[in-house]
Amino acid sequence: MKAESRHERIISAVTCAIALLSLAVFAGCRVNRAGNEHQKDQILYTVIGSDPRTFNPILVTDASSGQLTGDLFETLLQLNPVTTLPEPRLAEKWEIAPDNKTITLHLRRDVKWFDGQPFTAHDVLFTLDVIYDPKVPNSSRPVLLVDKKRIEAEAPDDYTVVLHLPKPFAPLIAALEGFQVIPAHILEPVWKAGDFNHAWGINTPPDQLIGSGIYKMARYSQSQVVNYVRNDSFWMKDEHGGQLPRLHGQNVTIVPDANAEYLRYLSGQIDVYGPRPEEVYPLQQKKDNHELDIQIEKIGVDTGTLFFSFNRNPRRYVKGGITDPKINWFTDLKFLQAMAHMVDKKSMIDLVFHGLAEPAVADISPENKIFANPNLKDYEYDPKLAADMLEAAGYHLVKPDVRTDPKGNRLEFDLTTNTGNPDRNEMCTIFKQDLERLGIKVNYRPLEFTTLVDKLDSSFDWDCILMGFTGGVEPNDGANFYRSSGNLHIWNPNQPTPATPWEAEIDTLLDQGASEMDITKRPPYYWKIQQILHDQLPIIETVRGQRYASWKNSLENYRPKVWGLYKSEWMEFKAD
């Protein structure tokens, strides 16, 4: 799981109407001109909601950095988003021994790094060494620990890697789908010098970012744009021997505001777009009325999770021998249950998602047909029940707008999410207003995304957050979120030992689920994890939106699926 960024809402109806009217006046010439330029140059124009925090794929913990480095580096395998089965990438084939403890990867021999050096098995072994280095903070290590041990690897030759597991590990193939290999000849000396954590930061000149992916980064201008050019030495060819990818490059503009992103799509400045719920019907109308030459398609339900979480980290609340009373509230199950009953999911669905969403009960999406727990009962929105629960637990309403804890401290905390995200802003506003009716003072302070991630990763200076994470087909890919020692276990990360019995139980269930090789016997372990999270409430689920994709008709072979783009290397613009 990786932290997910998007946008922010509240533009007045008048302002929006004026903006759209202005666009309508000159949209005709702009749309055609931009579209023709994109077709002529074979450059895909897109946007992203925030700046990256790093260009080092091993150190990525946020969605923006992950997206912007994703095309620079190749993985050993890849997920087919249609079949959800693994497919070859840097490893052209693989064999699993009968004991399920040895996997042999046969690597491609025609892959070169951007600087012309050959890709070899040594690069894979080096990448594993970096991931397992405790001095290198990364999200891959929890996913690749087997029985709390590293996977041992050897290279009999330059194009063969043999992985030796301490015991069978069902999620390994899925883990290799996200395993981005980095160049040993560039980064191994840096790692040995102890400076890997500073390598390839956002100030690194793009020509020094040496990958093996489909695109090279040509330019990064902070808070403005990222430009990519095609890797003309990329190993993949089409059925006629033509070079892939077919696009010659990408232009990714950094646009923190969703309304601005939408206007860019309407004006033809970007080629693909993930519409928000309130934009689906207007876009469909513009398509039907031939105002825009686009496609719009529902592709499924969000595969990620969007939740409120209260900070349980002692590093935030216990300092200099003084304990902030908030930690007592945020670890009190009665308090958390009351908070869960104050999440007005129906209003969020109706007002924020325009009916295009459903209540979320678990962190695993129902799109994951195998691992989503179908038996969980939702916490119904019930302010009276929540008030009664708080009173019974000693959180008394002492004035119409003031509620105190059992020791007389006023219930007051900060609530945050990332700026530039209208949907989350409105959800936080709904939650804040409802809690204040219970006498709980909520200080809502949205933060710029990179600042927010710094608070989650480093300072732990937050109380309550509305946060989203992406989801995958393999639940163990979220081990850095589930596991008590994980760096994305956001309510109390990087625990040396589990802080609670239920977190220890989740750690055990993760190990058991990962070692079960029979796919029909694995779901109960992850259903139980979802049940524990549902009962203990380190995260309070909100809603899960329907996902739509829209793109220009001039863009061919653009095939968005709920689990990702299908054969994105074949995308191209129609010739004029």
Stretch-by-stretch model annotation:
Residues 542:
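Active-site-proximal polar cores
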Residues 47-98, 129, 210, 214:
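N-terminal lobe/hinge region of extracytoplasmic solute-binding protein
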Residues 50-66, 90, 117, 172-182, ...:
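A structural "hinge/loop" feature
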Residues 15-24:
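Bacterial N-terminal signal peptides
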Residues 95, 106, 141-193, 219-221:
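Surface-exposed binding/hinge segments that line
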Residues 8, 28-36, 82, 95, ...:
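Extracytoplasmic/periplasmic ligand-capture domains
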Residues 188-191, 356-375, 548-551:
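Mature extracytoplasmic/periplasmic domains
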Residues 4-16:
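Bacterial N-terminal signal peptides that target proteins for export
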